[in-house]
Amino acid sequence: MSDRFDAKAFLSTVTSQPGVYRMYDATGTVIYVGKAKDLKKRLASYFRQQVGSRKTETLVKNIAQIDVTVTHTETEALLLEHNYIKLYQPRYNVLLRDDKSYPLIFLSADSHPRLAVHRGAKHAKGEYFGPFPNSYAVRETLALLQKLFPIRQCENSVYRNRSRPCLQYQIGRCLGPCVAGLVSEDEYRQQVDYVRLFLSGKDQQVLHQLIERMENASKALNFEEAARIRDQIQAVRRVTERQFVSGNSDDLDVIGVAFEAGMACLHVLFIRQGKVLGSRSYFPKVPGGTEMSEVVQTFVGQFYLQGSQMRTLPAEILLDFTLPEKELLAESLSELAGRKIQIQSKPRGDRARYLKLARTNAATALTTKLSQQSTIHQRLAELTKVLNLSEINRMECFDISHTMGEQTVASCVVFDANGPLRSEYRRYNITGITPGDDYAAMAQVLKRRYGKALEEKKIPDVIFIDGGKGQLGMAIDVFNSLNVSWDKNKPLLIGIAKGADRKAGLETLFFVPEGEGIALPSDSPALHVIQHIRDDSHNHAITGHRQRRAKVRNTSALELIDGVGPKRRQVLLKYMGGLQPLLNASVEEIAKVPGISQALAEKIYNALKH
């Protein structure tokens, strides 16, 4: 029992109602969140002579304070528990580190519906199909749908302001509902119905309707229309033959589990209408000594309850592990979905095959992850030795990217003991410096990054500066000038100078801004981890710079025209549907834009053409 916490006095005040409890350490940090049907009984179990596990024993030693929140029901407690876990990320809870919502396909409720990728809460009116494992899978499906059923995928701002069809119409990927007379209302509605049926897994219904339409067109001697529908039928058949998985209209998620060397992998297989939409592996953060049942229980709860607004819940969830609170979880999910959701742990037939597939994928992904992590750990151990440090828990690396000094972007990437922490990668738009002054750019990003309060765990052990001796000297000056409460002398600052011809393996490391640096052997594991973090930083900076440059270019041509201020630029781009349609527009089309006279339209036309 913790001598900093009076458990007996605390327990005498606790109710026996359902609720959620938060445990804090001496610094006021939440270290564990739990829920209970009976708060008094559950909390008392932590302070017995025998607590049951090493993890619980360590947890109790660190308790300095406990807060409780009483709820009406156990289901309410379960939801609140997972909200608190997401909010506080306590170190003794199993944590699902990637809880992003899955991308969906959105079919809008407009008079001429459009297809789009959607991620997040379902606020827009329309229908949602999915989930898909990643945005690539969604875009691939949208590209396929464009070929099969050419309904629009453009933004409403573009659609409303077109006076002639775009390139998608010219190549047969859109029916062109933006221009009157190109497609009838009935034909467009029919294609939207096909999309709806196809995304709902009703491929055969789509084929039957298309075949019927082809036969009717043939009987009416409309052979050109019949041939077009025939080609559409063949395209749909080719796709459905590739996608077919089972004869059942299964609508379920299948979760396979693998556990080895203190690491867990949960592989989720998404099956909708009997088709595998994709799958994804998760590696939750597991505190030492955690039971496997707790890992699975917490993962399933966080996976569905924390993202309930964003996720499409299946009718059934298959697991290869019996959950201790299966009924409660199923009840909570059913309540959220407004329909019954089952959780099965002993399926038969096709479902058992799905589960075996998920389990195999989990084991394979875990083996790969352990192998990669072993390599990362070896490289970090070697780097720790090379830098003469006791340990490295966190590293950060900075790089600058610009084109002739314009649209300068700085990047910061973060590695921990397990490699890249992509959720903590950041970009900084650099302003107010002399264009092309990389030293000033680096000074600005370092001041913005470190000139504020930092948590102990956020203070890096090593900071890499891409740029060699000059940049390192400037970084040291910045750190000397910092007036902060945290230990600014903790990070080791290292400059990385690129090798001759910028070849990998010829980098030089500088620890002081004068004198000779050191070059590690090209086969050194320590050098490999430095190259990894440096390359990630470089790529992150370049990507950010290109995005910023593209954004500026979209409006820079208009900014040079006298008489076209910010408001007119906005109206022009909105009315025309973007810069490219404006570049292709005639003087007469530009003059139709509200607030643009014939004379100004000619000026805009001539400026954009020349």
Swiss-Prot record:
Residues 204-239 form the UVR domain. Pfam families: GIY-YIG, HHH_5, UVR, UvrC_RNaseH, UvrC_RNaseH_dom. GO terms for molecular function: DNA binding; excinuclease ABC activity. Residues 16-94 form the GIY-YIG domain. One of its GO terms (cellular component) is cytoplasm. Keywords: Cytoplasm, DNA damage, DNA excision, DNA repair, Excision nuclease, SOS response. InterPro entries: GIY-YIG_endonuc, GIY-YIG_endonuc_sf, GIY-YIG_UvrC_Cho, Hlx-hairpin-Hlx_DNA-bd_motif, RuvA_2-like, UVR_dom, UVR_dom_sf, UvrABC_protein_C. SUPFAM superfamilies: C-terminal UvrC-binding domain of UvrB, GIY-YIG endonuclease, RuvA domain 2-like. One of its GO terms (biological process) is nucleotide-excision repair. It is found in: Cytoplasm. Interacts with UvrB in an incision complex. HAMAP family: UvrC. Belongs to the UvrC family. The UvrABC repair system catalyzes the recognition and processing of DNA lesions. UvrC both incises the 5' and 3' sides of the lesion. The N-terminal half is responsible for the 3' incision and the C-terminal half is responsible for the 5' incision. This is UvrABC system protein C. The lineage of its organism: Bacteria, Pseudomonadati, Pseudomonadota, Gammaproteobacteria, Enterobacterales. The gene is uvrC.
